[in-house]
């Protein structure tokens, strides 16, 4: 699991952290809980994803 402790309130481009709790309409999958790797660079509500 990948845990990212910092947040990025702005929409994240490729290779950046995307916070689903601030951008609930972000498309693509993502990791909830402590965050996770998402091929689409998206994250669900309340989760965080790392865009590749």
Curated annotation (Swiss-Prot):
Protein's organism:
Dictyostelium discoideum (Social amoeba)
Q: What is this protein called?
A: Uncharacterized protein DDB_G0295473
Where composition is biased (Gly residues), the residues are 27-52
Residue stretches of biased makeup (Basic and acidic residues) = 16-25
Renumbered to this chain, region (Disordered) spans 1-52
What lineage does UniProt assign to this protein's organism? Eukaryota, Amoebozoa, Evosea, Eumycetozoa, Dictyostelia
């Amino acid at each position: 699991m990948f845990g990212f402790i910092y947040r990025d309130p702005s929409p994240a481009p490729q290779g950046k952290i995307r916070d689903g709790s601030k951008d609930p309409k972000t498309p693509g999958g993502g990791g909830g809980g402590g965050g996770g790797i998402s091929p689409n660079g998206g994250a669900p509500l309340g989760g965080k994803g790392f865009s590749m």
